[in-house]
Amino acid sequence: MELNGAKILYTIHTNIPVLGDFKITQTLESTWIVMALLSALAFWLGRDLKLENVSKRQAAAEFIVERLDQFVHDNMGWHFDKFIPLVGAIFALSIGCNLISVVGLWSPTADLNTEAAWAIVVFIIIMYYKIKTNGILAYLKGLLDPIFLMAPINVLSEVSTPVSMAFRHFGNILSGTVISTLLYWALASLSHVIFGWLPGFLSQLQLFQIGIPAFTGLYFDWFGGCIQAFIFCTLTTIFIKRAAGEE
């Protein structure tokens, strides 16, 4: 049994100093597939919108938008509408990246780089609003409170926001992948122990691998994935709201 990270599929030799060659990994491949599917879904849901006699497709699209609006408003307030697309994009991409493993593709959220990229985007927005609200000098002065000796700790506290968000999401998704893999391997070993003494093809029966891994995959890929997407987006809205000086 082996547990490996995302494989490098292609390497584009650019010879760019410092950056080096551009590597296309399973993470990039799966992420592009998810983005393409989400774009196609958004295009399909947004076509031929009407004010009257709406179709079931339009009703579903309106329901999604209304729930997303309500989520952002409940966590941030009605004057933060401009963050609805950001939160919606992160939520949809997170769920899509989690669920793509159901069809056998590599889950981008099992790669820390994915969550780190989302967390960095959120961190930049948080820093922008902190500086916009308090001013650059007041923000830098705040890093010295209550005494200048606390500056390193305050800086670490700021940096810990994106780090904790990324590792929380990544750790939960990766743990689900590891548990599912270990369970599948254990069931294969159990099948071999029980049926291995039988003659012919009967010794190769993998009866215990039927059904049980599907239920664990259903939990970790569907339920657990949706929960982690919800938590990440909730933290995003709360941190941005606090950075803007809202309580």
Predicted features along the sequence, with ranges:
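Selective transmembrane helix interface/packing segments
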Residues: 1-247
